[in-house]
């Protein structure tokens, strides 16, 4: 629950940062698209193993991907469902985006072995920064609600064992690699985060992404 005197956590796909990126066209240059291998005319099947606020999943769906969102927190799952319903009712365009999104409540470690996709994305709760004021309020509220992700290494191992062609880990730009997780095939850096891309045997024939390690929008 949010602490007294603080705004309650809400998920909004119509306004805010998500709406701005879609309206301005900024979404098309997002580093996540390059990390996942999104390209014009290429409709990917994506599993978002850590749905959270749902922004990355909505971005991918807005670019044409079919996205399965997995969220283990019942409270966050309910907020996501409300946000998606509001977006669906807002306009035909947003309803089309929502139609490409499937929301599941559960633990991705248990669900990933039962699913198949082109890409699995993992965006765990990031380590707390020393200067906590730099963390956006909504992320503080989310952390207060769901806590840390002490099992992120287990989740990554489940993702790397999934039936998919690549796994994309979203991680703070200058954070140390996750202990016990193999070295990524390559990295794509944003302003504050990086995308560690693991190309798996199913996707081994894919060429190294052009401009890997280049800075794009986070």
UniProtKB/Swiss-Prot annotation:
Q: What is this enzyme's EC?
A: 2.1.1.242
Keyword annotations: Cytoplasm, Methyltransferase, rRNA processing, S-adenosyl-L-methionine, Transferase
A cellular component annotation (GO) from this entry:
cytoplasm
Judging by the UniProt lineage, the source's domain of life is: Bacteria
Q: Name one GO molecular function term.
A: rRNA (guanine-N2-)-methyltransferase activity
Q: Which Pfam families match?
A: SAM_MT
Localization, per the record, is:
Cytoplasm
| InterPro entries in the record | 16SrRNA_methylTrfase_J, SAM-dependent_MTases_sf
Has the keyword Methyltransferase been applied to this entry?
yes
Annotated residues that bind S-adenosyl-L-methionine are located at 55-56, 71-72, 123
Catalyses which reaction(s): guanosine(1516) in 16S rRNA + S-adenosyl-L-methionine = N(2)-methylguanosine(1516) in 16S rRNA + S-adenosyl-L-homocysteine + H(+)
Summary of the function given for this chain in its UniProt record: Specifically methylates the guanosine in position 1516 of 16S rRNA.
The UniProt entry's sequence similarity note says: Belongs to the methyltransferase superfamily. RsmJ family.
What PANTHER family is this protein classified in? RIBOSOMAL RNA SMALL SUBUNIT METHYLTRANSFERASE J
What protein is this chain from? Ribosomal RNA small subunit methyltransferase J
Report the source organism: Rhodopseudomonas palustris (strain HaA2)
This protein's encoding gene:
rsmJ
């Amino acid at each position: 629950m949010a602490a007294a005197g603080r705004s309650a956590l809400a998920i909004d796909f119509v306004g805010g940062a998500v709406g701005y990126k879609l309206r301005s066209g900024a979404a098309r240059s997002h580093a996540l698209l390059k990390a996942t291998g999104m390209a014009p005319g290429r409709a990917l099947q994506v599993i978002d193993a850590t749905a959270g606020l749902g922004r990355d999943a909505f971005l991918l769906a807005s670019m044409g991907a079919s996205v399965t969102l997995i969220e283990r927190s019942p409270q966050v799952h309910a907020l996501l469902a409300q946000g998606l319903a509001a977006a669906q009712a807002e306009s035909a365009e947003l309803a089309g985006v929502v139609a490409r999104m499937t929301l599941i409540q559960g633990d991705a470690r248990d669900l990933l072995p039962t699913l198949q996709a082109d890409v699995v994305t993992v965006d765990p709760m990031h380590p707390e920064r020393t200067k906590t004021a730099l963390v956006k309020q909504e992320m503080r509220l989310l952390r207060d609600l769901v806590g840390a992700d002490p099992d992120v290494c287990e989740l990554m191992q489940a993702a790397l064992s999934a039936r998919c062609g690549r796994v994309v880990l979203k991680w703070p730009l200058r954070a140390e690699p996750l202990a016990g997780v193999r070295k990524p095939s390559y990295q794509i850096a944003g302003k504050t985060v990086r995308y560690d891309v693991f190309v798996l045997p199913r996707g081994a024939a894919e060429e190294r992404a052009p401009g890997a390690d280049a800075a794009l929008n986070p």
